[in-house]
From Swiss-Prot:
Keyword Repeat: yes
Record PANTHER family: F-BOX DOMAIN-CONTAINING PROTEIN (PTHR31293:SF23), RNI-LIKE SUPERFAMILY PROTEIN (PTHR31293)
InterPro entries from the UniProt entry: F-box-like_dom_sf (IPR036047), F-box_AtFBL13-like (IPR053781), F-box_dom (IPR001810), FBL60-like (IPR055294), LRR_FXL15/At3g58940/PEG3-like (IPR055411)
Protein name as it appears in the record: F-box/LRR-repeat protein At2g29910
Pfam families, per database record: F-box, LRR_At5g56370
Sequence ranges assigned to domain F-box in this UniProt record: 4-50
LRR repeats: 101-124, 149-173, 175-199, 298-323
Keyword vocabulary terms for this entry: Leucine-rich repeat, Repeat
Superkingdom field: Eukaryota
SUPFAM superfamilies: F-box domain (SSF81383), RNI-like (SSF52047)
Amino acid sequence: MGSRDLISSLPDEILGKVLSLLPTKRAASTAVLSKRWNNLPALVDKLDINDAIGGPGGFPEFIDKTLALLTNSTTIKRTSLNNEFQYGESQVNTWIRSFLERGCLQLYLNAQSLYTIDTEFFTSNTLVELTITGGFSPDGLLPPGGVFFPKLKTLSLVLMTFVDSDMYELFISGCPLLEEFLLRNDEIEIPPVWNALVSSPSIKRLTIVHHFPNYREAHDGCWFRTPNLVYLDYSSYVPDWYEVDLGSLVEARLDLRSWERLRDEKAGGYGDCDSVYDDEEYPDDPILGDVTNLVTGLSNIKTLHLSPDSLEVFYFCCKSMPVFHNLLTLSFESAKKEAGQCCHFSSISLLT
């Protein structure tokens, strides 16, 4: 009894779903199996393009052929582009433009080399989720009307910089439906260019990681103009001041990092609130940073998570401590006694 090719007898729609689960280079290679499979790669709705599979040889040609196959395909739900090797900048921009023109819903861009994305075409009426990480740096003219992504709801910028710091604000304002925003900038070797401003009436979940201890000037101030924000995860060295609008905030996770003089390096860690400083050793050294406005803006939240650094900052860098009338859950990595000395709550459940 001869063998039967059962999988080839499946409907095209099912085979397209199966191929979508494979790395795109593997899925494209099935076109040589038989005539039955010649056009099936055009049915995939997810692209996973990674030059780590097979190396850089022939990689640009492979992408060009793949995009040609998808000319008449259905909407691409998700596209992931991972570049470990260097390619021509105009070539990479052409690929990104093609992904967006094909109605991509989710786009993930990652590169080890540096590329400048031409923002004049960096726009989409269908994209709902965008992640940019690594060497990509948007720059150039704004798209017509200044709106990049009218349907975008989730934006993640990881280790990515804009040439112009004001582009952060313009980029966010160009996403009128944005609900989730993640910004991570903690590469010590790269000078920070974020303007320390998040302003959006639509953002509900915000994650910020901003660590530049060697650039004190990057921490002059910080604005959170986010009236509908319900969740905040914030990690940064303490700036000199805050301006916040957090009236809807329900939960906050804080990792507020003190500057070098707040560290008890001799003890190999952090001492208690009364022993971190030696007034005789640092008689004229001012305390850097002020979190008073930030803490006041958190006074209506229900859940608060604090790092040990945050407790130190609350103690030394907050001029007045509000009462947290609505707080139900407090978690922190320290002794309950220390937390009680620094904060005042009405009715809470302590988790340590």
